Regions:
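Generic start-of-chain signal for non-secretory N-termini
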Residues: 1-3
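Active-site and donor-binding regions of nucleotide-sugar-utilizing enzymes
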Residues: 6-173, 177
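Long, charge-rich alpha-helical interaction segments
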Residues: 186-198
């Protein structure tokens, strides 16, 4: 039996928004979601226990997500080769390999969930889901953060359209709604975006 939904959170703000999303549901739908707390960049303290007691979530998991720098073999793939084809070839290998290396640390089988909500899909979880070909919903990392700092465009400056096309085909991964397996991107205000994703 498929589980309803799961939220992957990296910050307290992400958890706050996940709670609001759950509280906004009809009462009979609440309490059926899972919550994943990534410890890659945040110390959540006793939040796991508190979330379990809240009744808002059916299950709460720790996620020992690893940054790409944890995997020494990936460092070489981040180096500039001096050519666009060489860089794109390394980028394809990097995206695939980071997803693969992350797998032992992933605490749940995401294929068991109907809806997957990922805050900050630029973190390794985005690469993992892309590598596994698992569809998900991206959620804006912070209130209007894309309005003020569009990481997808900044991180992929130089030949952005080519890279976005490659991401749409699944050859590389780009965050914030550009990846093949990202179904949509939830933002606070689409009117505020310079580059709305269509």
């Amino acid at each position: 039996m498929q589980k309803e939904r799961i939220y992957v959170c990296h910050t307290f703000y992400h958890v706050y928004v996940a709670c609001l999303k759950e509280l906004n549901l009809e009462k009979e739908r609440r309490g059926k979601a899972s919550l994943v707390l990534s410890r890659m960049s945040n110390d959540f303290g006793n939040l796991k226990a508190r979330a379990e007691k809240s009744g808002l979530f059916e299950a709460v998991y720790w996620f020992d997500e690893k940054p790409f720098t944890f995997f020494e073999e990936l460092t070489e793939l981040k180096k500039d080769t001096g050519s666009l084809p060489g860089n794109l070839r390394n980028r394809m290998r990097f995206c695939r390999r980071l997803g693969e290396l992350e797998e032992p640390y992933v605490p749940v089988n995401f294929r068991e969930y109907g809806d997957i909500y990922v805050f900050c899909d630029s973190d390794p979880i985005g690469y993992y889901l892309s590598w596994k070909k698992i569809y998900y919903h991206a959620v804006e990392d912070g209130l209007d953060c894309i309005r003020y700092y569009d990481t997808a465009h900044y991180d992929n400056r130089g030949h952005f359209r080519l890279k976005a096309a490659m991401a749409a085909l699944g050859f590389i991964f780009i965050q914030n709604g550009y990846g093949k397996y990202c179904m949509d991107m939830e933002v606070n205000s689409i009117e505020a975006l310079d580059h709305p994703i269509s």
